[in-house]
């Protein structure tokens, strides 16, 4: 093990190799060293590098005295236990390394009682390379020394010689075995919850993987649509089924069909036709018969006989009709004894509730086989509607007499001239016609005086307006009546309330409030006085009553006296009743 070793010359390396020889057993198992920073080599598998490394002093500018040497510092005991605890927690399973570390500690701390000399640290160590502390046991034997101890060209050989001179005088304390054992046990006991959680998750994941591995995989069933035929095949099958059904129904109908009699006759005639033809041919061949003349019927030759036959036919029809009427009259059902008999309640309810289950209905609709003539019916309907249509009355002009001929007329100059010229002319003079002023007089009148014909539309319009006005008047009257009725009701309610108050013997709360308040206050005072009086009486009884022990002693004394009295009476041969009767007799005397 080397402490404070720099990247120096071969002398220091040889010295450290002689003091701390490397172990060949640990070199095979321990990994290679890690190199940090500027030539700082730390073994990865060595667990005492933190414990043995002293504090680094990197602040070179703050040293005001300019000293080039310093004393090595020994780590405190508490920091040492923390480092050991962390080291043992990092690898608790390696028993071989733990044994080797214990041996290193024993060999390193065997010089515990020696003093700590003050060794000066050259300045080149502080500025050249960082101080390192590593275990030689953790270094593998096959690694070359040049890789473990890199050389530095910056430092002079005097500095290496000074380091080799004071490195052998360093004393590092060694922990006890009990402390190491307790630290190892504590590391095993103080397992972090994160490790438990990680183990639990790992076990859960492993269980899920095992369940997934044990799961059996099966192929899914073939879907149903794979077995379905194509659309064309479905349609062909449907068409074949339809044709087969049609053929079967046709055969069924033909099997149930019954031929008519004339069809049979026609078939028989067709079958007999060849025979008749052969018979006719044979008759013609044998001998032609003589033509026989048919007799004329008497109805043709004698007209009176035909009339008689018609009368007999008519008489027969009349008799048939009369016989039918008689049979109908005789076949009528007898009159029932109880007419209009009401059905029972159960029957009525059954008819009402179970009418939808009825199969035999009273109403039997009759189908009219004759198709009506809709066009003729529509024309007849239009004709009837035109006849019933209301025709508007036309305006009829009534003649009137104009009295313009009776008005006086003054001749004008033009009329006089015409009259003078007329004397000369051979034409006869015409009678002067007065001018009619009827039109001018009528024009001077107002429009209301003109004779106007009132149509049905105007009459209906006036009636509608009149009805609307009447409705409005009625609604106004109803509103007014409601207002008057409301006012009357309010006045009546006021008068009723006033009369009820006047007739009611009870008084209002405002009138009785003061009297009730006074009465309640007086009752409270009386109750308080009675309560105080009862309290005083109770206190007096308590004060005058003897104590409990006095009552007990008095009762005991009384019982003793009564017992003595009974004993005395028994000794004298007397009874209590005899003595009591005698005492009552003496008191009465």
Curated annotation (Swiss-Prot):
Entry keyword set: Coiled coil
Polar residues bias: start-end ranges: 151-166
Stored InterPro entries: FAM161, FAM161A/B
Compositional bias (Acidic residues): 92-106
Biased composition regions of type Basic residues, renumbered to the chain: 287-297
Disordered as annotated region, ranges: 1-166, 265-297, 386-444
Gene Ontology terms: cellular component: cytoplasmic microtubule
Biased composition (Basic and acidic residues): 265-275, 386-396
Quaternary state and interactors: Interacts with FAM161A.
Descriptive protein name: Protein FAM161B
Natural source organism: Mus musculus
């Amino acid at each position: 093990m080397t402490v404070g070793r720099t990247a120096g010359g071969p002398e220091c390396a040889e010295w450290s190799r002689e003091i701390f020889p490397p172990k060949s057993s640990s070199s095979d198992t321990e990994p290679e060293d890690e190199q940090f920073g500027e030539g700082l080599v730390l073994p990865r598998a060595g667990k005492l590098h933190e414990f043995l490394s002293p504090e680094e002093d990197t602040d070179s500018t703050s040293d005001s005295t300019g000293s080039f040497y310093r004393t090595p510092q020994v780590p405190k005991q508490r920091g040492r236990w923390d480092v050991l605890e962390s080291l043992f927690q990092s690898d608790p399973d390696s028993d071989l390394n733990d044994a080797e570390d214990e041996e290193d500690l024993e060999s390193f701390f065997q010089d515990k009682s020696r003093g700590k000399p003050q060794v000066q640290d050259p300045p080149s160590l502080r500025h050249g390379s960082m101080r390192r502390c590593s275990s030689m046991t953790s270094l593998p034997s096959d690694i070359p020394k040049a890789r473990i101890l890199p050389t530095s060209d910056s430092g002079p050989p005097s500095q290496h010689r000074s380091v080799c001179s004071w490195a052998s005088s360093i004393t590092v304390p060694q922990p006890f075995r009990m402390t190491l054992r307790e630290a190892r046990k504590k590391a095993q006991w103080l397992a972090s919850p994160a490790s438990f959680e990680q183990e639990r998750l790992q076990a859960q994941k492993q269980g899920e993987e095992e369940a997934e591995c044990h799961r059996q995989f099966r192929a899914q069933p073939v879907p149903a649509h794979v077995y379905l035929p194509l659309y064309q095949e479905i349609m062909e099958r449907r068409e074949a089924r339809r044709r087969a059904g049609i053929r079967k129904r046709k055969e069924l109908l033909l099997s149930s069909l019954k031929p008519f009699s004339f069809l049979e006759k026609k078939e028989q005639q067709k079958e007999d036709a060849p025979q008749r033809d052969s018979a006719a041919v044979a008759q013609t061949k044998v001998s032609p018969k003589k033509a026989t003349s048919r007799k004329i019927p008497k109805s043709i030759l004698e007209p009176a006989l035909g009339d008689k036959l018609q009368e007999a036919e008519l008489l027969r029809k009349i008799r048939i009709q009369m016989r039918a009427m008689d049979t109908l009259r005789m076949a009528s059902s007898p009159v029932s004894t109880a007419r209009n008999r009401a059905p029972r309640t159960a029957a009525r309810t059954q008819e009402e509730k179970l009418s939808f289950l009825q199969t035999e209905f009273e109403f039997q609709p009759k189908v009219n086989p004759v198709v009506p003539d809709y066009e003729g019916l529509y024309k007849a309907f239009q004709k009837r509607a035109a006849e019933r249509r209301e025709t508007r009355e036309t305006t009829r002009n009534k003649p009137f007499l104009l009295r313009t001929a009776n008005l006086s007329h003054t001749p004008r100059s033009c009329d006089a001239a015409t009259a003078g010229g007329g004397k000369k002319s051979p034409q006869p003079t015409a009678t002067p016609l007065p001018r009619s002023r009827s039109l001018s007089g009528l024009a001077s009148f107002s429009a209301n005086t003109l004779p106007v014909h009132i149509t049905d539309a105007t009459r209906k319009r006036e009636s509608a307006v009149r009805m609307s006005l009447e409705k409005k008047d009625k609604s106004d009257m109803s509103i007014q009546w409601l207002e008057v009725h409301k006012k009357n009701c309010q006045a009546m309610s006021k008068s009723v309330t006033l009369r009820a108050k006047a007739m009611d013997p009870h008084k209002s709360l405002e009138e009785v409030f003061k009297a009730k308040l006074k009465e309640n206050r007086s009752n409270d005072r009386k109750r308080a006085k009675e309560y105080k009086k009862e309290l005083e009486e109770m206190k007096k009884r308590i004060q005058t009553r003897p104590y409990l022990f006095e009552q007990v002693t008095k009762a005991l004394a009384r019982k003793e006296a009564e017992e003595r009295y009974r004993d005395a009476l028994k000794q004298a041969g007397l009874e209590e009743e005899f003595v009591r009767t005698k005492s009552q007799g003496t008191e009465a005397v």
